[in-house]
């Protein structure tokens, strides 16, 4: 009981700090932004928030302009006659360090990822955009954020003094998975916690990570970007927070270490290794059953578990030939080919192009809504087709080799 009370007090302090930081840092920007909107003017973000460290000589600058070289289209089933335009209501006169540089685009050696957005550090290179994002939240969005903050109070905590022995890690794994599903998870898997999953700001020393997914409301997702879609996503993230906290507490009650890891943790690499799906061209995970209609959560632990394996459902072959997300993205932020990022070749979304549109519209998510895999019932067919095509290519290559 005392542990729960201390956690509740910590949660109240966290919400108070967040609310005060939000109010004091963004009230002038919020007021001036509304005034500028009424006048039809752009607001200059350089005039707000704490100073941002200038990029060093030779470091690339952020370019927030959209990519106009890509053909545009709009999926007929999205709930918009047209997507919101890319005529932004703000500007930055002194460009800061590129978000792609922070992300490690073009780097051939591995390094841990670095925090880049949703940091609450407004002196960060992308801090001006984040300050605006926080400033223009609607009251409903702000309440939703506070509810999420409340859930963080039980992300960590004290473990029971007596440890439950685990003689059969396989049986324990099934129990933990069943409990996670009982709490509302649609997908769950276990992976070894590797260096690809941690950030410089949150080093973790656990052997395992439990990765899970909460299903998204597809109808709301098809309304993106909108307040409805944003509030629905916040509610879904609140669900991942609650499940993460409860599973972590359940493990700690057995005398083992466990920590809910939501912020500053690389959810997608963990989910890939746990067998939940594959990374798609739009930068999100694709699952055969759910497409990209889910939100991820994770728990790091030393509880002895049996790990799952990555899956191959044909996403890499499919995305190499598909253009749906690249052409539906209004600022065209999605690279059509894989990029080298921190020593790994992978699909990548241009952060400098994506995030201004995300901020302007209080969020986005068009790319995962239009993804063909997200249409119910199509995933298995896509997998079968890709595997058949792959087999034909292999047979053709073998025949050509024999005839050479």
Each PLM stretch: what is its role?
Residues 2-79, 86, 340-404:
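Flanking helices and flexible, charged tails adjoining ferredoxin-like Fe-S electron-transfer domains
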Residues 16-19, 116, 138, 252:
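Acidic, low-complexity intrinsically disordered regions
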Residues 20-23, 120, 142, 150, ...:
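A residue-identity detector for tryptophan
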Residues 38, 53, 69, 82, ...:
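Short linear sequence elements within intrinsically disordered, low-complexity coil regions
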Residues 58-98, 144-179, 234-250:
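Short N-terminal secondary-structure initiator segments
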Residues 93-186, 345:
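Eukaryote-specific, low-hydrophobicity, charge-rich regions
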Residues 166-170, 177, 181-182, 186-393:
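Catalytic cores of enzyme domains
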């Amino acid at each position: 009981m005392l542990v729960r009370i201390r956690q509740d007090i910590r949660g109240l302090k966290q919400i108070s700090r967040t609310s005060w930081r939000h109010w004091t840092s963004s009230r002038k920007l919020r007021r001036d932004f509304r005034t500028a909107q009424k006048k039809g003017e752009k607001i200059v973000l350089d005039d707000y928030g704490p100073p941002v460290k200038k990029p060093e000589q030779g470091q690339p600058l952020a370019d927030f302009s959209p990519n106009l070289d890509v053909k545009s289209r709009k999926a007929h089933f999205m709930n918009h006659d047209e997507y919101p335009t890319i005529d932004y209501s703000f500007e930055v006169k002194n460009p800061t360090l590129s978000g792609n540089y922070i992300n490690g685009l073009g780097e051939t050696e591995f390094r841990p990822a670095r925090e880049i957005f949703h940091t609450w550090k407004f002196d960060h290179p992308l801090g001006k955009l984040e300050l605006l994002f926080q400033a223009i939240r609607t009251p409903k969005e702000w309440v939703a954020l506070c509810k999420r903050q409340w859930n963080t109070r039980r992300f960590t905590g004290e473990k029971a003094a007596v440890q439950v022995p685990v003689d059969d890690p396989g049986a324990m794994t099934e129990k933990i998975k069943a409990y996670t599903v009982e709490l509302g998870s649609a997908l769950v898997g276990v992976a070894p916690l590797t260096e690809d999953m941690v950030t410089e700001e949150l080093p973790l020393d656990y052997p395992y990570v439990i990765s899970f997914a909460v299903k998204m409301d597809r109808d709301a997702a098809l309304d993106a970007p909108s307040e409805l879609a944003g509030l629905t996503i916040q509610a879904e993230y609140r669900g991942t927070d609650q499940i993460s906290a409860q599973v972590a507490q359940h493990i700690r009650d057995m005398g083992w270490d466990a920590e809910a890891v939501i912020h500053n943790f690389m959810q997608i690499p963990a989910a890939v290794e746990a067998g939940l799906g594959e990374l798609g061209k739009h930068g999100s995970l694709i699952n055969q059953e759910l497409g990209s209609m889910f939100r991820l959560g994770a728990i790091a632990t030393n509880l002895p578990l049996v790990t799952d394996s990555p899956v191959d459902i044909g996403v890499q072959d499919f995305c190499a030939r598909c253009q749906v997300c690249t052409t539906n993205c209004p600022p065209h932020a999605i690279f059509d080919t894989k990029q080298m990022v921190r020593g790994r070749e992978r699909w990548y979304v241009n952060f400098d192009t994506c995030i201004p549109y995300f901020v302007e519209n209080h969020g986005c998510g068009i790319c995962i809504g239009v993804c063909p895999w997200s249409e119910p019932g199509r995933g298995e067919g896509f997998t079968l087709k890709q595997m058949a095509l792959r087999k034909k290519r292999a047979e053709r290559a073998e025949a050509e080799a024999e005839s050479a």
